[in-house]
Each structure stands twice: as structure tokens, then as C-alpha cells.
Amino acid sequence: MTLDLDPSSYLENMKLAVVDAIEDIKGFDISVMDVRKLTSMTNYMIVASANSSRQAKAVADNVREKLKEKGYAIRGTEGEKEGEWVLVDLDDIVVHIMVPTTRAYYNLEQLWGATEGRRSAIQSENGEAESRRGHIKPE
């Protein structure tokens, strides 16, 4: 499979593929954060919740499997042994799947400056963030 080399559609397709893979395994409370102006490590962070460590591992497995099928490179995975917080590194996107208590404790959305005021500034600079199915919170 060849991927579209246009950077914006490449990233958009990748984001949608990640969200679909998360939703396939009933991951929830999905946030997509554009962090391009905050770090050079990645373009987007996607944070999602899972009801248990077992589900978090299953969501991470599905993200890897579905994106690999579509031809995207998987750089690495961390946290699968414990499962409270599983990270999937796709280079352009870093995916964090957490159980709710871990997510609340680390609060990555706030840590990365995606507070309401920051979200508004990022969205006005980059255009309104899109949500795939209406229940994704753009950050």
C-alpha cells in the first residue's frame, strides 16, 4: 500500500485511523492534541481512556495492528506489562491509552498546555479542530 505523501492529508488520515482503532475496542474520552507548536518530538498526541489495564493493552494492540495494516510505521510501545498507561509511538503521533485514575493523575491535557484558553489559541491559529464522530474532544 502506498500512502499519500501530502503531509496534511497523511497526518489527517493517520489521526483518523488511530481514533477508529481506539473506538473499535471501545476506548473512550478521546482527545486529539496538536502539539506541533509545543514540541519537535511529535505532531499530535492522542489520549484515550480504557476501563481496565486489560482493555488498555487491547486498545494499544489494535492501534498497532490497524496502523501497520495501513502501512504506517510503529516506532515502539511502552507500558504493556502494567497496562495502566500504554504508549504507542507512531513518530508523527504519540498515543496514550490510560485507565481513568492514571489519566486523571497525570492529566496530560493540562501538562501539555491544552487548557481551555490554550485550546482556543491553537484552534484559532490552526483552524477549528475537527472531531471524527462528535464525541472526540479536540484539544
Segments predicted by a language model, with ranges:
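Compact, glycine-rich, soluble single-domain proteins
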Residues: Q55-Y72, L87
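Glycine/charge-rich, flexible interdomain linkers and switch-proximal surface loops
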Residues: D29-M41, R75-D92
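Long, contiguous binding/interaction regions
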Residues: M1-K37, N51-A58, E65, G79, ...
